[in-house]
Amino acid sequence: DANSFCQLPAVVGKCRGYFPRYYYNTEAGKCQQFIYGGCGGNRNNFETVEDCRATCHSH
């Protein structure tokens, strides 16, 4: 599955930045906002909800 990262949990990361981002929540079946610290994390991290939906909509 090319977009298997859509199933990964939201990861804030180790840095202390404040970046509102979106991730695909598999339990809710939709993209939701979380706060990203600015480093680390995984690919389930999108700048816009539109990008999140376009990438992970089929899960």
UniProtKB/Swiss-Prot annotation:
Subcellular location: Secreted; Nematocyst
Keywords for the protein's UniProt record, in alphabetical order: Disulfide bond, Ion channel impairing toxin, Nematocyst, Potassium channel impairing toxin, Protease inhibitor, Secreted, Serine protease inhibitor, Toxin
Cited InterPro entries: Kunitz_BPTI, Kunitz_BPTI_sf, Prtase_inh_Kunz-CS, TFPI/VKTCI-like
One Pfam family matching this protein: Kunitz_BPTI
Domain BPTI/Kunitz inhibitor per the UniProt entry, residue ranges: 6-56
Gene Ontology molecular function: potassium channel regulator activity; serine-type endopeptidase inhibitor activity; toxin activity
SUPFAM superfamilies in UniProt: BPTI-like (SSF57362)
Disulphide bridges: C6-C56, C15-C39, C31-C52
UniProt-listed PROSITE patterns: BPTI_KUNITZ_1 (PS00280), BPTI_KUNITZ_2 (PS50279)
The UniProt record lists the keyword Membrane: no
Cell cycle keyword on record: no
Function: Dual-function toxin that inhibits both the serine protease trypsin and voltage-gated potassium channels (Kv).
UniProt protein name: PI-actitoxin-Aeq3a
Organism of provenance: Actinia equina (Beadlet anemone)
Taxonomic lineage of the native organism: Eukaryota, Metazoa, Cnidaria, Anthozoa, Hexacorallia
